[in-house]
Amino acid sequence: MKQGIHPEYKEVTATCSCGNVIKTRSTLGKDINLDVCGNCHPFYTGKQRVVDTGGRVERFNSRFKIPSTK
């Protein structure tokens, strides 16, 4: 590797809004604030909801004559 052309790789702390603190390394060089992390994201916590907004699936199926699977 060439000397002097690579950015410094520093230890940073990523803090989530839920209070979870993650220590990692980054070239950013300053602490990071996160909105969501693996501890509070709905997909990982199992609290994810599938929202059918305004019957769009039924509208699509009726438009293309796809029989309902229910």
Curated annotation (Swiss-Prot):
PROSITE patterns: RIBOSOMAL_L31 (PS01143). GO terms for biological process: translation. The keyword Ribonucleoprotein applies. Keywords: Metal-binding, Ribonucleoprotein, Ribosomal protein, RNA-binding, rRNA-binding, Zinc. Its cofactor is Zn(2+). It comes from the Bacteria. Binds 1 zinc ion per subunit. This is Large ribosomal subunit protein bL31. It comes from Haemophilus influenzae (strain 86-028NP).
